Amino acid sequence: MGTYLYLLKYELKTIVRDPLSLYMCSFPVILLVLATTVFPLLFKSMDAANDAALRVTMLIVLLVVLTLGSFFLSLLTALLLVENKDEHTLATIAVTPVGTSGYIRFKLAYIYAMSVISTMLVLFGTKHIAGDEYAIRGVSLFDNLSVLDIVSFALVNGLFVAALALFQSSFAKNKVEGFAFIKGTGIVALVPMLLVLDSFRDELQYALGVLPNFWAVKGMLLELVPMESSANLSFPAYLAIGAGYNLLLLLVMYRTFLRKVTY
């Protein structure tokens, strides 16, 4: 236990010393500030009678809130893992009692915890501080969102953060390649934005299902903004599929990362 506490202190010092890492780690707080102050000003500047435009704008904002906060934590994890590979830190850790696999599991565990906490912080904060601002015809979209909904989404979304971080860091040999690969895979965070289009509200929505973050985001979006469609699943079903998919991807990428490091 003492070894892992020492590692945690080391990881936190590494993050605090690097301005970029510190920014990525604090992005959920920045997002919360935007969601409770800036975005509501955008809604107020729009014509309240134009329900369609207001609805689309809120959908886009909610997708940003649901996806970007945790995505930055995956970038942080990927960069830290690439740095470990680039500086041969993992080779040193391999001969310690923790071992490389133990260290990777530890890193994923605390990043997963950070992701879950940050997601709940953003959603609970937005709901309680500015929930009434996210309203159409006087009805707040956050009225549909329960504590269990937020916690469930955060737990599933955290799996995606860990899986994506391993995917991004597995194929990069150094920091330069790491930045390039991260930029290339960054589109994953933006693709769910297509859900605002009418064409992706029925069966075609499942074309986006290849993306591991689609399932939890889609389920949460339907809780916030209910949309009638025979193609839609229930909220628990979306989360269950998302959890299974991300766990499988996490296992595959964990083994891939260790194989890349070992050989």
Task: Give the label of every model feature segment.
Residues 1-28, 88, 262:
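Aromatic- and glycine-rich beta-strand/loop motifs that create alpha-glucan
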Residues 113-160, 166:
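Secretory targeting signals
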Residues 73, 98-131, 239-246:
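Selective transmembrane-helix segments that form parts of the transport pathway or gating/packing helices
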Residues 15-44, 59-76, 112-119, 182-195, ...:
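Hydrophobic alpha-helical transmembrane segments of multi-pass membrane transport/permease proteins
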Residues 2-6, 198-230, 236:
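Short hydrophobic, aromatic-rich alpha-helical segments embedded in or entering the lipid bilayer
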Residues 167, 224-228, 239-263:
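Junction motif at the cytosolic side of a transmembrane helix
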Residues 19-23, 149-187:
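A structural motif at transmembrane helix-loop-helix junctions in multipass membrane proteins
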Residues 49, 74-96:
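Transmembrane helix boundary and interhelical loop/hinge segments in multi-pass membrane proteins
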